[in-house]
Amino acid sequence: MTTTTNTHTHAAALALGDDALVLSHRLGEWMGHAPVLEEEVALANIALDLLGQARILLSMAGDEDELAYLREERAFRNLQLVEQPNGDFAHTIARQLYFSTYQHLLYAQLAAREGPFAGLAAKAVKEVAYHRDHAEQWTLRLGDGTELSHERMQRACDALWRFTGEMFRPLHGLDLDGTGLDETDLDRTNPDGTDRDGTAPEGSSPAGTDLDSAWLESVKDVLGRAGLAVPDGPRTGAWSAGAGREGLHTESFGRMLAEMQHLHRSHPGASW
């Protein structure tokens, strides 16, 4: 493995690890506040699955504790979607549906081919299938429930839709469209996956087209069965597509990070 390839593997591991870490923390905020005890257990299990994934991925990029607790906000590479506040229960479910559908499709691809993420993906895809199915069942229940639950679920789907396009931006070290990037491609590309002349490298998809299409098909099917309308707004982040992957985050992320890192930073170098 060349230095360039290793660097890009680390970058991909960091981004995917940050996704899992941040969403795990968000779901953990529900502990003691979930609507029923059964859901308390379900959300805790999903959070723990994601935390386990985060530990493996962050360890591929460096020291897991240092990366989780000692980086500043701009150094995190997670999607803006996963950092969004829990809001009401419908918002949490919509966020989980969008992300778990993407994560399941991604890990299924990674598990099916050789590479540094194949082992993790083979295990994680089974966990994520449960996460996706759990979110799907709640989407159906809320969307096809009372007038109020339908309204809240639709509002949540609409509000989070603009963060979904970022999931399908190119990510160094990952092959999203099945064609792959060789080491020459990696050497001549920018962090956003484009050539240094601003174009997409030959043999790559600038927006993970196949993955995006499969995600849209799956989400549209769930929303349709739930009696919910597919949001029609733009699918870009708060400032620009790919903002979270570039270290640009929404306001609420800074507050979440301060809470998550408080204990570790309060006792630097302590042994636990």
Predicted regions and their residues:
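Acidic, low-complexity proline/glycine-rich segments
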Residues: 14-19, 63-76, 225
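Conserved alpha-helical segments that form or flank metal/cofactor-binding pockets of metalloenzymes
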Residues: 47-71, 135-139
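Extended, helix-rich structural scaffolds rather than catalytic motifs
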Residues: 150-187, 192-272
